[in-house]
Swiss-Prot record:
The gene is ligA. PROSITE patterns: BRCT, DNA_LIGASE_N1, DNA_LIGASE_N2. Residues 609-689 form the BRCT domain. Belongs to the NAD-dependent DNA ligase family. LigA subfamily. GO terms for cellular component: cytosol. Its EC number is 6.5.1.2. CDD domains: BRCT_DNA_ligase_like, LIGANc. This is DNA ligase. NAD(+) binds at residues 51-55, 100-101, 129, 152, 189, 308, 332. It comes from Shewanella oneidensis (strain ATCC 700550 / JCM 31522 / CIP 106686 / LMG 19005 / NCIMB 14063 / MR-1). Pfam families: BRCT, DNA_ligase_aden, DNA_ligase_OB, DNA_ligase_ZBD, HHH_2, HHH_5, Nlig-Ia.
Length: 689
């Protein structure tokens, strides 16, 4: 009801002319509305307005605050952007010490903790939650307004990070409702989500800046910035996990820890959705195992789970020891970082030709498994780490992610440590290893000639969107190569039915059908053939544009980068990939062998303007088409000149909606994009044949 009244009040104020008399209540209403929508988005996970509407209201508030600075509110959402840089952090003495937790490392440790607790207070339930790997923060609200925030520090004295905490969008500047205490201290974890961490390091990599080792370091470094504008750019988040000081002490609070967290949530503070109450010991262990199993899928880093006695009265009875509460414990996951010795480096070649350095390690137990190899990514990463063979290194393994070296221990470097030399020739086929300007990855130039790339290249060549060899699945391709019946794509067209009966579970009838499918695939189109070659970043649409622009393979083979850039939707990077592919003798040999084997396509005639009525238009397909498969519809629209995109935007000219059309249809209707059905599409295609 309060939300409805707020929206109604804002609408009334927005409909009035802005004057010095109406500006202040309008700014108050805008601030209140935007803060409420922030809570709905970050806490309730139930946004009630679009991003564009939110942005419009925010811009309106910023404009008003620029005109009437005397009316700017302390809890205005515009205050999240960061203010003037500080000279240093002030010290804050916590009203109540921020203690650390004891640790349990296995079931025996937790069972002993459970016994100590139950011996004192009897039967207990536990409130269980993920142990976030971030920075502990204390936030003080007075009369519902965020007054100050501090780091844990040594538990007694922390640093004032108020301005930085205000930039975290999930933390309300004013509490929701009115049933909160006059003064309330909220404790929780500030952290950097995995996606934000990856984006931050990607920006650093592009600028050749130092990258953070892990999200915890990134979160801590971001919160301890003297310039809060930097913190504002770091996309930090926050989960509340406890109440601290509450005044007056007589204020009615929930009687269990779980219910107090729900109380915090009702005030607009975010809490983890992974919190669960466990009544039995076996439920606690099941919770631990479940979170551990899903650890790599969670959007944030965790290093264990925290178990707290749920009943607040029991917590008070149990009390504290010197540095930790008796009623809580951190049940830690196996360590994800360990030190070991780098014994050597091997270089592997992937299906796209990427040459990746792989570290050979002295086996070490980390993240629950024994690790003997780790990725070094590329030459830039080797240089950034300053790593050498013989170094002591820090290994990190997170979930199912390939283990990686995140740092070296320089003080342990031996005198006989050796520099890592990146190969100039492919370790598999001997072709030149090249690294294009602006790219971090070095690649084997062998292309289809390179055995390491061959299996994936041939799978791609035979796939439905390429030459579409019916019945030629991945397992058959693997067998053909393993039995040395096929060495290159051209060898597919030398296969006979009798040769293919050598494959597992391949009788003469199946082999004959596959041989017929191979023969039929010889007749294709130039766009399909170009796509089948597997040129980097040349998808179906780009292949079609290349074919339409140059008209023949011969013309494309000798095209310069300048000529390639003239093709629709092709920039300098893709142009370089195409030119580079056709400059390799190995690739030309494969192409010539395919043509000699009988692969052919009809000549392309340049379409007239009348034949391309959709030229310059962007179309999108969604839902199920009953009379035309998606790829055929896409190809026919491209013949008529349309660009077929994968998503709807304001630049979309038409959406073809089949059965069970979903979010794309809704977005098209929202944007006012023209929508037609399958029957209208068929009529359009028939009229332009």
């Amino acid at each position: 009801m309060q939300d409805i009244q707020l929206d109604k009040r804002l609408s009334e104020l927005l409909s009035q002319a802005v004057t010095p008399q109406t500006a202040q209540p309008l700014m108050q209403a805008l601030s209140q509305s935007l803060n409420e929508h922030n809570i709905r988005y970050y806490v309730d996970d139930a946004p009630s307005i679009t991003d564009s509407e939110y942005d419009r209201l925010m811009q309106q508030l910023k404009k008003l605050e620029a005109e009437y600075p005397q009316f700017v509110l302390a809890d205005s959402p515009t205050q999240r952007v960061g203010g003037l840089a500080l000279a240093k952090f002030e010290q804050i003495t916590h009203l109540k010490p921020m203690l650390s937790l004891d640790n349990a490392f296995d079931e025996a440790d937790f069972t002993a903790f459970h016994k100590r607790v139950s011996d004192r207070v009897g039967q207990v339930s536990f409130c269980c939650e993920p142990k976030l790997d971030g920075l502990a923060v204390s936030i003080l609200y007075r009369n519902g307004v965020l007054e100050r925030a501090a780091t844990r520090g040594d538990g007694t004295v922390g640093e004032d990070i108020t301005e930085n905490v205000k930039t975290i969008k999930s933390i309300p500047l004013r509490l929701r409702g009115n049933n909160y205490p006059e003064l309330v201290e909220v404790r929780g974890e500030a952290f950097m989500p995995k996606a934000a961490f990856e984006a931050l390091n990607e920006r650093a990599r592009l600028k050749d800046d130092k990258q953070f080792v892990n999200p915890r370091n990134a979160a801590a470094g971001s919160l301890r910035q003297l310039d809060s504008k930097i913190t504002a750019s770091r996309a930090l988040s926050f989960y509340a996990y406890a109440l601290g000081v509450v005044e007056p002490s007589s204020h009615e609070l929930a009687k269990t820890h779980y219910e107090q967290l729900q109380q915090l949530k009702s005030w607009g503070l975010p809490v983890s959705s992974e919190i669960k109450v466990c009544d039995e010991l076996n439920q606690v262990f099941a919770y631990y195992k479940d979170i551990l199993t899903r650890r790599s899928d969670l959007p944030f880093e965790i290093d264990g789970v925290v178990m707290k006695v749920n009943d607040i009265a029991q917590q008070q009875t149990l009390g504290f020891v010197a540095k930790s509460p008796r009623w809580a414990i951190a049940y830690k996951f196996p360590a994800q970082e360990e030190m070991t010795l780098l014994e050597g480096v091997d270089f592997q070649v992937g299906r796209t030709g990427a040459v990746t350095p792989v570290a050979r390690l002295k086996p070490v137990f980390v993240g629950g498994v024994t690790v003997s190899n780790a990725t070094l990514h590329n030459a830039d990463e080797i240089e950034r780490l300053g790593v050498m063979v013989g170094d002591t290194v820090i290994i990190r393994r997170a979930g199912d992610v390939i283990p990686q070296i995140v740092a070296i221990v320089p003080e342990r470097r031996s005198e006989d440590a050796q520099a890592i030399v990146f190969p100039q020739h492919c370790p598999v086929c001997g072709s030149l290893v090249e690294r294009l300007e602006g790219e971090a990855v070095a690649r084997c130039s062998g292309g289809l000639f390179c055995e390491a790339q061959r299996k994936e290249a041939i799978k791609h060549f035979a796939s439905r969107k390429a030459l579409d060899i019916d019945g030629m699945g991945d397992k058959i391709v693997e067998q053909l190569i393993d039995k040395e019946l096929v060495q290159s794509p051209a060898d597919l067209f030398k296969l006979t039915a009798s040769m293919m009966t050598m494959l597992d579970r391949m009788g003469m009838k199946s082999a004959t059908n596959l041989a017929l499918a191979i023969e039929a695939a010889k007749t294709t189109t130039l766009p399909r053939f170009l796509y089948a070659l597997g040129i980097r970043e040349v998808g179906e649409a780009t292949a079609a544009n290349l074919a339409a622009h140059f008209g023949s393979l011969d013309a494309l083979r000798i095209a310069t980068i300048e000529q390639l850039i003239e093709v629709e939707d092709i920039g300098e990077v893709v142009a370089q990939h195409v030119a580079h592919f056709f400059a390799q003798p190995h690739n030309l040999e494969v192409i010539d062998a395919l043509i000699a084997a009988g692969v052919n396509w009809p000549a392309i005639e340049a379409p007239s303007a009348d034949e391309q009525p959709l030229k310059g238009q962007t179309w999108v397909l969604t839902g199920t088409l009953n009379q035309l498969n998606r790829n055929d519809a896409k190809a026919q629209l491209q013949v008529l000149g349309a660009k077929v995109a994968g998503s709807v935007s304001k630049n979309t000219d038409c959406l073809v909606a089949g059965e069970a059309a979903g979010s794309k249809l809704a977005k098209a209707q929202e944007l006012g994009v023209k929508v037609i059905g399958e029957d209208e599409l068929l009529a359009l295609l028939a009229a332009n044949r």
